[in-house]
Amino acid sequence: MALLKISVVVPEGEVYTGEVKSVVLPGVEGEFGVLYGHSNMITLLQAGVVEIETENQKEHIAINWGYAEVTNERVDILADGAVFIKKGSDDRDDAISRAKKLLEDASSDRLAVSSVLAKIESL
């Protein structure tokens, strides 16, 4: 299976880069998945969690909002704010706290924020 290249960038710099099997993005019209060979598109992202599936594990990045450019072999995400939540990391609890704060500050839609926060807490 061919791998998809992904990069997640915020104004302060790069948050994540790598080759992955798939990505699930929080689009404004709902979540959508991307595999290698996906159609080209540019879309607006809402506050949510970017789910990244690598060869060995799933990784998660909370974003407050941004844009994604998808081509058949790569996904480039430009987000206003992002927090990488790495499983097994010593600072995972701190990352989850920062992700919650980022999302709470991102939207006044409490229902949408609470569903994303529930997803983060289940990681």
Curated annotation (Swiss-Prot):
A Pfam family of this chain: ATP-synt_DE_N
Keyword set includes Transport: yes
Localization of this protein: Cell inner membrane
Keyword terms: ATP synthesis, Cell inner membrane, Cell membrane, CF(1), Hydrogen ion transport, Ion transport, Membrane, Transport
Single GO MF descriptor: proton-transporting ATP synthase activity, rotational mechanism
Cellular component, GO annotation: plasma membrane; proton-transporting ATP synthase complex
Gene3D superfamilies: F0F1 ATP synthase delta/epsilon subunit, N-terminal (2.60.15.10)
Recorded coiled-coil stretches: none
InterPro entries: ATP_synth_F1_dsu/esu, ATP_synth_F1_dsu/esu_N, ATPsynth_dsu/esu_N
The keyword Cell cycle is assigned to this record: no
Membrane topology: Peripheral membrane protein
Superkingdom of source: Bacteria
Family, similarity comment: Belongs to the ATPase epsilon chain family.
PANTHER family according to UniProt: ATP SYNTHASE DELTA/EPSILON CHAIN, ATP SYNTHASE EPSILON CHAIN, CHLOROPLASTIC
HAMAP family: ATP_synth_epsil_bac
NCBIfam families on file: ATP_synt_epsi
Quaternary structure and interacting proteins, as annotated: F-type ATPases have 2 components, CF(1) - the catalytic core - and CF(0) - the membrane proton channel. CF(1) has five subunits: alpha(3), beta(3), gamma(1), delta(1), epsilon(1). CF(0) has three main subunits: a, b and c.
Function: Produces ATP from ADP in the presence of a proton gradient across the membrane.
Identification of the protein by name: ATP synthase epsilon chain
The species this protein was found in: Helicobacter pylori (strain P12)
Gene name of the encoded protein: atpC
